[in-house]
């Protein structure tokens, strides 16, 4: 798939940004503070699950701490700037280090879109039967893929993008994850004492997660 090389046009009179897809944006991109917040929120939720603090969900022995990846973030930002609530193609999620990344997306008008997006993905935990953690498989009638990706143990990198449409005020948040999860018949994470199966030891910043 060929992507259009886009440019950012700043319209001084209205402070709009226009990308190659024709979407006019009143806001776009994440600054360092926003990146740190969404990364921290992901890791705190992973830590919550790993340490057995999520009701009905077992502890995890091998869940990794997530780290920010600029290539994932650049792809996610391009996805957000389409201002379309639609998953991107494999080509649009491809990275040099990890191959094709996983993707979660959000569109809405809440005042805190970054936190809202992650919270909505995580809330799918209420429909997760713990039995599926040992051998993941899709089951009809429940949307759980965003949560499963959020807590997939072997995922170690994340990058997110953000854009707000000037036309309707809709905010778009896309996060890309690598290595991606949701592999059928693979474990989401290994049950056991938190961080007991870490290959490189336990995270000092997020005890219960692996380095």
UniProtKB/Swiss-Prot annotation:
GO terms for molecular function: serine-type endopeptidase inhibitor activity. CDD domains: CAP_euk. It comes from the Eukaryota. Residues 1-20 form the signal peptide. Pfam families: CAP. Keywords: Disulfide bond, Protease inhibitor, Secreted, Serine protease inhibitor, Signal. Contains 3 disulfide bonds. SMART domains: SCP. Belongs to the CRISP family. Venom allergen 5-like subfamily. Shows trypsin inhibiting activity. The protein is highly thermally stable, since its incubation in boiling water during 10 minutes does not reduce its activity. This is Scoloptoxin SSD43. It comes from Scolopendra dehaani.
